[in-house]
Amino acid sequence: MTDILKETGTQEYKAFLTGDNNFRYKVFPEYKANRLKNARPIHLKACNEHLVNNWNAVVTDGCEADDLLGIEQTALSHEVDASCIASIDKDLLTIPGKHYNFVKKQWTLVSPQDALHSFYTSLLTGDAADGIKGALGIGPKKSQVILAGCETEQEYYNACLNFFSCEDELIQNARCLYIWRKENDSWNPPS
């Protein structure tokens, strides 16, 4: 944490940890089912306790840490350089704003259009780590061909819809992949 604060040039931060309760399990009961419980790092509990006790990390209830990061970044988006998400998780690139990958020591500025493109790319390709399959036979290269030329959310949605067995499957995947921008947010198809 000290290194991240130094590298990002700030002393102000909010840290979030994912708790046990997560709405995504209600949306998709197989969410993260492919992760073995005993495959978690042996010192994870001690690390989380350290972050809570020494760095004032907040443990989420009902959502993931990613969602609280998305809410904070969105709330501060009107102020230039007011917020930055420090994470190695590519899923967070669906949130507009500044991002810092503290392992690669890399800054990324994600525009609203970049965030939309990243979300729909994830929708097509799925997220193996979370057990979300995506559209059958669609990988990163095919997804870029499918999404080429899309500008509006409606265009992205329509482009993706053709590659799912039904609209309900697309909606279920999208609701699991979508990172909140406000409290108790939910993804809905564009209308």
Give the location of each predicted region.
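Extended two-metal-dependent nuclease catalytic cores across DNA- and RNA-processing enzymes
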Residues: T10, N34-P190
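Domain-level signal for Mg2+-assisted phosphodiester chemistry and nucleotide/NA-binding surfaces
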Residues: M1-H50
